[in-house]
Amino acid sequence: MEDIKVMIKPDWVSWDEIHELLLAAHKKNIEKGVVMNTTTMTGEEIKNYLGESGRCIVALCGNELVGTTSVKIAIGKSWFDKGKTVAKGTMSAILKHYQGLGLLEEMNELTNQYMKEKSVQIIEADTAEDNVMMRKILAKKGFKEVRFFPAKNQNHFSVYFVKWLEGCPFSDRFIQRKFNLSKVLTKIQYGPGKVERSHFLSRICQCLKKLINV
């Protein structure tokens, strides 16, 4: 197998190629009817989502794009990250033939280096409610479940995770209560398939979420 190089995305790798890789890598999930936000975004939308402060890492076998991951940097606005410099890992994908070679670890080394440069205080991630394995992995890595939500452009519920790099400022009990409240209100608001039960009920749940800040 030709040598694989991991690097910051060069200009000659287009954002449309990143989009096509995400589609190819997540083909099985798509066939199962699992809609993922990263696979519904166009190349231009991916570029705009990451913004100027984001960083896209790629794995190249010759001139072929075989893997990618990205990190988005922002200032937090929620109860768990307000005013903090936040990094969110996103859009990770590796073609099946190249999995198991440690490419994700290599790409993550570059994203971790970038996060240090940006003085990141909090790392965030999300995964599908039913992805029990990933939820366990994130928990073992020190992430806490802070929010249950219906993600945009997805047909399933997701769980949002946070890891405070400078020490967690909240008690486990407080965090669990916030998460449980967001889950209960979301389940009241939406039925199976993430379908709103009624417009009136949805508005009430949205107002309650804002009122109790979840």
Where are these regions (language model features)?
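A short beta-loop-alpha structural element at the N-terminal edge
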Residues: 2-22
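Conserved GNAT-fold acetyl-CoA-binding loop/helix
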Residues: 9-12, 23-47
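A short helix-loop-beta-strand connector motif used in the catalytic cores of GNAT acetyltransferases and
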Residues: 46-58, 67, 88
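A short, internal acetyl-CoA/4′-phosphopantetheine-binding micro-motif in the GNAT/acyltransferase core
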Residues: 90-100, 127-128
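Conserved acetyl-CoA-binding loop-helix of GNAT-fold acetyltransferases
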Residues: 94, 100-113, 136, 140
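Conserved GNAT acetyl-CoA-binding A-motif
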Residues: 115-127
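Conserved active-site alpha-helix within GNAT-family acetyltransferase domains
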Residues: 129-147
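C-terminal "cap" of GNAT-fold acetyltransferases
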Residues: 151-206
